[in-house]
Amino acid sequence: MRIRRPFIQILILWFVLSPVWAWCEEKPLWELGAGLFLLQMPDYRGSDENRRYLLPYPYFVYRGDILRVERERISGRIFETDRVLLDISGNGSAPVSSSDNPDRQGMADLDPTFEIGPSLNVTLLENRQDHYKLTLTLPVRAAFSTDFSSVRHEGWVFHPRLVFQKADIIAGSGVSLGISAGPMFADRGYHRYFYAVDPPYATPTRRAYEAGGGYSGSTLTVGLNKNIKPFIISAFVSVDFLQGAVFEESPLVKNKYAVMAGFSVSWVFLKSSRMVEKRD
């Protein structure tokens, strides 16, 4: 197992780790702990090269009225009603060394990316008695890459999703289920960063290719979460389906699907005595 750079712990855990949701209930204002995370993911969506990471990480949760720091995201709440929430969402990708990826041999490395932008979240269906909820999320994010000496804007991403949450899926089990699904769209700049092959990098087995903007595939994610105090156990599987994506014919796309899976154990050893309502 390889850890390419120390920052990747934060990048993966805050932006890539698929969300596992908890039902609305009272929670401590903040929690502090540590954990261990096992992740397998492709170099990029469509790559046939996969990496495994085993990472320790700090566990920190803050549930403020405006700023929320959760296991799955950092968000700033701009506007909220009973059914509608406007906040800030993020995402990201890990760096790729082209020398370690046969399909990118001789090309420039892929720097890590991060995405940030507003997200409109609309509750379509909610049943507090049976503990389930259906939400439509509509995030629009600007994507940036960085080599830690400069930051470059790479493009825009729109990733609408339907999110279903169910607490205690088997009565008395304490296991929460989350399922999300939806298409992804991105502009030419974003697709070009991952899938374009400029003429100087073309080879007999890797033709030149110019990526366009549009449909970027669809994603299905399933996650499970269980609290066994003072531990929190989470697992997820996420699959990207790339059939019909505008970059499908890129010579850098070797798989028409991409699978990412992870498992984490968090130990919460310190928390606030002040309780607040936990809202997703």
Where are each of the predicted segments found?
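Short loop/turn motifs that connect adjacent beta-strands in outer-membrane beta-barrel proteins
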Residues: 23-30, 45-46, 65-85, 125-134, ...
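Residues that define the transmembrane beta-barrel architecture of outer-membrane proteins
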Residues: 30, 50-56, 82, 110-116, ...
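Residues on the lipid-exposed face of transmembrane beta-strands in outer-membrane beta-barrel proteins
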Residues: 36-40, 58-62, 73-78, 116-124, ...
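Sequence/structural signature of outer-membrane beta-barrel proteins
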Residues: 39-45, 93-99, 123-127, 141-149, ...
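Outer-membrane beta-barrel domain signature
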Residues: 44-49, 75, 105-111, 127-129, ...
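Outer-membrane beta-barrel translocator domains and adjoining extracellular loop/strand segments
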Residues: 46-50, 99-104, 147-154, 189-198, ...
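Outer-membrane beta-barrel transmembrane domain signature
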Residues: 151-232, 240-245
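Predominantly the C-terminal beta-signal and adjacent terminal strand-loop region
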Residues: 220-280
